[in-house]
Amino acid sequence: MSTIEIVSTVAEYTEIHSPVSSKFLLPSARDSSSSISLFSAIFWFWSWLFFKIMNIFLYYIPNIIVNLFSVNFQITLSLSSIVITLTGIISFCFLIVRYKYLTRYSKTTKSTDKPKSSNKNIDLVGSIKKNKRGDSKSTSNYLDEFLSAIKVFGYLERPVFHELTRNMTTQKLSSEEILYLDEKLGFSIVVEGTIQVYTKVNSVNSSTTSNSDDNELNFEKDDLLTIGDQCYQLLNEVKSGSPLSSLMSTLDLFKPVDPDTMSNRLFSPFELDSNPASNPLSPDNTGSKSFDPLSSGNFNDTSLSSSDRNYPNIVARPKPIEDSNNLNTATIAIIPYSAFQKVQSKYPKATSHIVTMVITRLYKITMNTIHSYLGLTREIIRSEIQLNESEGAKDSLPSYLYDGVIEKFYGDKNNETLLNKTAESPSVSINKTSSSSSSLPKKSTTSLRPLNRNQSSRYVVLDSRSKSTHPGDLLSSVPLSRRSDYYQTHTTIQPDPEEVRSQSRTKMTSPVLPKRQISSNGGPTLKGHSSSTTKFENIRDRTFSDEREETEETSLRIAIIENIFKILGINEVSNMIGSMSDLNSRSSSVNSSVVGLPSLMNNGNESKYPNGIFDFNTGKVRYDSISSFPTSLNKGANNNLKFYDTVNQSQLKDMDHENDKSSQVDINNLMFKRKSIPIQSFESNFYDVKNEFSKHLNIKYFGPNTTLVEQESFNSGLYYVIDGTLDVFYKPASKESENLTPMNKKKLYTVKSGGLAGYLSSIIGVRSLVSISTPGDKGVIVAHIPKNEFSKLLDKFYFLQLPVASKLKSLLSSQILTIDYALEWCHIPAGDVLCSQGDLANGFHIVLSGRFRVVRYNNNKSSEVNPDDNTDIHDYNNNLIDESLSYKSRKKKDDITILGEYGHGETIGEVEVLTASRRTNSLIAVRDSETARIPRTLFEMLSLRNPSIMVKVSRIVANKMAKKDNIGIPSTISSNVPLIVTNTDSHISNDYKTITILPTVSGLPVRDFADKLVSALKNIGRNVIALDQASTLTHLGRHAFDERLAQLKLSGYFAYLEEEYQTIVYVCDTPLKSNWTSTCISQGDCILLLADADDDDVATNIGEYERLLMKLKTTARTDLCLIHADKYVEPGSTSVWLKNRIWVQGHHHIQMEIARDNSVQQGQKTSIIKNIAAKISSRTNTNIKSRLENVKTKAILSLNKFNNRLSRRTHSYKTVQAHKNDFLRLARILSNESVGLVLGGGGSRGISHVGVVMALEKHGIPIDLIGGTSIGSFVGGLYAKDYNIVSIYGRAKRFAKRVSSWWRMVLDLTYPVTSYITGYEFNRGIWKIFGSSEIEDFWIRYFCNSTNITNSTMDIHESGFSWRFIRASMSLAGLLPPITYGGSMLLDGGYLDNLPVMEMKKKGAKYIIAVDVGSVDDRTPMNYGDTLSGFWVLFNRWNPFSRHPNVPNMMDIQLRLAYVASVNALELAKKTPGVIYLRPPIDDYATLDFAKFDEIYHVGMAYADNLLTRWEQTGKIPPIAGMIDRSRIRNGEERKSLYRRSSI
């Protein structure tokens, strides 16, 4: 069909059907001859289609609508139908809003996973398995073991180290060899294997031990060694890398064979014990008369058999090994005697360093152990008694100097008694800068002349010259010496050897001491020698410019110093010999000095007797070791090739009991043929030493009943008694004697004129073990050298340290020296294991420095990777348990449980030693630590001879058990108190010794934070010091962190600070790659990680310092300190910080201003809303902006006025209070001085908690930890969230009003299948208060408890959304449904513990304020028979005359049954030490009386306020740290409170 035909057809159709007039029709088709284009046809078609559509929309549709509205219809509905329809529509809308929109908070605050628990087990398993102490390494060699043992010498310079190791030799011991260890030959170190050291016991003990096998107190058979008929007791086992010789023996190795001091050595103080019956040496002993540090000493009787004398005092052998495949051989390395002599000749200052280490070890290890643990303090004090009984202590001052001192202090001697009665001041001092004493009575007007070296004359200027009563006195014009035997000291003495030996025999047989010389000889004159051998000095050779020209005052001071030197063992001649020989020696170190130590002793004479050693006392060469044994024993031993002689143990059975005397060669003639050494060059140098000491001498007078030194004081000094006496008292350190009167002190001895007090405290550095005071009837004149000045002088004149230390060793008893030898100084690096679970208990440890964490394996079958269904994943102590038909919880425990930590001064492992069992736990070093190890064998040997030691240790163990009970840790499973299983760890002490402040990123105010923390620690009474890199470098030098061997020096300095201070704060103020940064991390017991709470970049990422912290793999506790500019925490912001930081165990919110620079601000994310607000404000008209600001200001002022009005109405506190300082709170937590607040449950009665908290704030009691149950968790959460009492009052009242609304409760009712109400209104009421805040966001550390009825445990909640867990803690069974969390159902925590005091104690709170508002059960006795009728019960309730009106119903019985565990927990809480228990009088209020908010609040407020006021007036409130500035009390100022009470 053509196009023209189609158009014609369409036109016809339109014409017929369309009602529109013809003028709208399409034009008719033209003839076929007309030409119409295709374009025109299409155009007309689309035009027609358009008009057609318009016709439909404009005509047809409106026509249909009009017709529809014109139709009439009628609907008829009843009223009930209308009501039902409307009700359905409204209910549908309500349900949508109720469950879709109003519960959105529950979905947004629902935790899918359980909250992250602090991961404290990081790398602990690997540490226990890989870093066990004592395990041998495959790559270890002799050098490694030697370097490990050489650490006992402390800091050694490289030349000194090479000099000691240059002549080092080794000796290997076979399994059957027994070694005689003579410490005079050299210093021995075990480099391979384990060596058992035995000490000789007397015949009586050995026979008793062998015959009394049934006696449990005797030694074990494995600990005994029999050589012939002599018995030896095992003293210690020395492993590879440990020294075999005693460190005290180095003092003898440094000393030369000095003939001039031989007579003094013949009579050693420890050889003449205070008890003559305990002298171990007999005059006819052919062995060495010098005391061996390992001799039996006080342990043995004086009557030794002839066979005993031929046996050595100390032997050693390799430890037998049960494995037959391994040979029990051992290798020792020996540093010979000559090496030490060369070191002290070439490097005298390095020698003084080693001597310092000897004294340090004696103080840290031996003295601390003997005094604090073994209870043998009297053995230590006895050495000071012997010091004052020695010859030097009996030399007094020259008479003319003594009379001058008496005259200057007392005036006329007849008025001395009058002075004692009328002295106004207890102390009158005459020092080098004072010219007179204003405190003296008016009768005494004489004054000492000041010390002035420029005005000194050749004559001793006496005060008597100025008196008119002595005209022309010849004495005033004669040059005087302060020593009457002056010329005797300037000689070279050559004693006769026979005379020396005869005097030796006389002194050894006679207990009477030689008569003391009247003169005060500061030089080394030999007692007992006549002056016939004296070569007098020509006085004409002296000039007027001689150094000995002095005034009377300087003469007095020098004379006192000479007497003190004589008592201390400082010998002028021995130092002179060392100085002169040192001038001839080749010095290769800058530490060498002209005034040096003694050099080599024998000028090459030792080659004359190479196979023996020279005995100091006999003057003979003694062929050492087992040469006194029968010669048959030495046939198989090639002794010429060994440093120490040995004997074959297998040949001991054939031993002859004949006694062969030791081969000795008399070399007295050789030793005493020394040439005279000129002394003039040394005299002036040694005079300078005495002159320097005299400058720090203070001459003082103390009146009667004056205490010079308190017991346990640190800074005392030396007191030389010039006139009078000093009484020395000792008070046992026990809890019973803390509050004793001075009458309970026991007087030990009296220091007479010429004696010395304060010796041990000054020489060793130990705290004063005694108290020193003057008698009650007379004063005393003393010369005092302060302890710090004395230490500085010894460091300056370091060559004096060796004679002082040697004198100290000579005073120590044999028992102390034996203990010193057996004690082991253990160094445990961070992360290493001190002892592992299951090891044999071979000793116990005393923590000297550092910290140890106690861990225990929970699953012994840890090797099983995939246990089957029958595997016991619980720990049932290997009991037979059949769980085939019971439900098994597949919840596995952690591999390791942390039980606690041990810090400075605590003891470890004594229980296992006493019970002879294996280690029950493993101990891991938190940081580099040191311990003193007491071997089991030494403890048993001491306990047999000193039963008081066993009593002392038993008391220590009992006190530790009692302490565990006090902090709520049951010691036994069979306790009468039911155990409540919780999901928290055991108690860990927070008393940290060292605290490290480490930033997350650079730019944080670490220094300011440290200053405020140190100030807070001082305010709570801690002795604290802050260490940064600058202060450490100042003390140790600028290369303190660069040298390899300097780490020993650094660790020694840190160990000293730990002894001196209670807390050390390490401030990490250096760049990331600094050595000081790594040092701070490794030294911290607790690491405070500083972070800016507003820095979102660091919150989501990890700072550079944190990466270093993870790289070093420290196991110390790490706490995150979030610094806020304001006291506000954005909800949910804290969990962002803690989410990915598994190495953080805790966190603190601290308010502190941070000066942020532009770079830091640019790195922080800004809020989008703040950006939009900034843009709008920038484009806003300035007038509108200013008006808005005015409105904002007025609103803030109005809000402040409202708050002030509310504060006055509710007796509120001042806005800023000092006791609520965040740094004080942090200081108390770190010092184990924190205060906890525990609020109990009780429904509406808990409103009284608000009043109690108000009273606590009013009285300025700080709160550091908060915990609660039920309503107590609600009020405690409000207080912990803002730490503001105003917000607590308003929000608590708002919640009470909502809960007391009956129509809300009615609308929340449901079908009582699980509970009466759905809990919606209750949940929403709590959420309205807390919002989306999490427990981590609370300003104060907080926890609440709940009862997990799924696992039958009490859960402690410390993280997560706060409203959810507070709701769980308030879920009363039957009324509210349980809260589901992690698959478990949680109910009210009051069912198990309504007052969680034990949990607060586990958090480390020292004082706990517990507020109990629980209901009181009816305790009326019931006796209604064996059967009970319900009608009878109902009748008795309505009968006023009934005897049984209170028979409980079913609900009462169920409630009492539910709270059985809580009642017992409450009784235990009341008995817990440190608990302040409060119970307001709220028994008349019901559980749901929330409508009586104001009434209950005022009851609690009035009760707590009156009670605390009464306790304050009577002084019953405990000394809470932070309420009083204790730093002022320590400085002697008056008590000052840190808070100001608000007026009512």
Curated annotation (Swiss-Prot):
SUPFAM superfamilies: cAMP-binding domain-like, FabD/lysophospholipase-like
Protein name per Swiss-Prot or TrEMBL: Lysophospholipase NTE1
UniProt similarity note: Belongs to the NTE family.
PROSITE patterns: CNMP_BINDING_3 (PS50042), PNPLA (PS51635)
Motif (GXGXXG): 1241-1246
GO MF annotation, one: lysophospholipase activity
Binding residues for a nucleoside 3',5'-cyclic phosphate 1: 681-811
Location of the PNPLA domain: 1237-1401
Class of the enzyme per the UniProt entry, highest EC level: hydrolase
Membrane topology: Multi-pass membrane protein
Primary localisation category: endoplasmic reticulum
Name of encoding gene: NTE1
Task performed by this protein: Intracellular phospholipase B that catalyzes the double deacylation of phosphatidylcholine (PC) to glycerophosphocholine (GroPCho). Plays an important role in membrane lipid homeostasis. Responsible for the rapid PC turnover in response to inositol, elevated temperatures, or when choline is present in the growth medium.
Motif extent (GXSXG): 1268-1272
Catalyzed reaction equations: a 1-acyl-sn-glycero-3-phosphocholine + H2O = sn-glycerol 3-phosphocholine + a fatty acid + H(+)
Keyword annotations: Endoplasmic reticulum, Hydrolase, Lipid degradation, Lipid metabolism, Membrane, Repeat, Transmembrane, Transmembrane helix
Compositional bias per record (Low complexity), positions renumbered to this chain: 425-447
Transmembrane segments: 38-58, 77-97
Lumenal side: 59-76
Signal peptide stretch: none
Record-annotated active site: 1270, 1388
Biased composition (Polar residues): 275-310, 448-458, 517-536
Positions of the UniProt region annotated as Disordered: 265-312, 424-552
Motif position, DGA/G: 1388-1390
